[in-house]
Amino acid sequence: PVQKLDPEKALAEVNAFRTKNGRSAVVLDARLSQAAAVQSKDQARRSSIGHYGSDGSKPMQRAERAGFHAKLASENVAAGQKSFSDAMRSWEESSGHRENLLRPEVTAIGVAMAKNEDGRAYWTLVLGAE
């Protein structure tokens, strides 16, 4: 079964990875979590992953719609992992996702997970700066 998302635990995992790699810690931002939830739900509904929403939106637009005045908004998505930790591991091992995790200018994150009808999990991590 898929583990329930614990945003505080997810934040701790992101910060552990960032600080281990010489980057500053970030905070959890409800607006970015809202933007992440929109994308996770959209992906689960469509059973596909990507960075464009079904309405054509990009991560920056979704962050701004949620009230986050983004100078920067990047997004990591994953599907099928049973926990945030598993999704995080896959991002750490993928160069583009790793780069997003370690962007020095990032100050805040938002996280979300939604499941499709088959119980497959769609994870979204939005990383941003205002």
Regions found by a protein language model. Give the residues of each.
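Disulfide-stabilized extracellular recognition modules
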Residues: 79-130
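Short glycine-/small-residue-rich flexible loop motifs, especially phosphate/cofactor-binding loops
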Residues: 15, 60, 98
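Conserved beta-strand positions that form and line the central face of beta-propeller blades
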Residues: 25, 76, 126
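A short alpha-helix/helix-coil micro-patch that ends at or immediately precedes a cysteine
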Residues: 2-45
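Short, surface-exposed glycine/acidic/tryptophan-bearing loops
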Residues: 30-83, 101-103
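Well-structured core secondary-structure elements of compact alpha/beta domains
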Residues: 1-4, 8, 74, 128-130
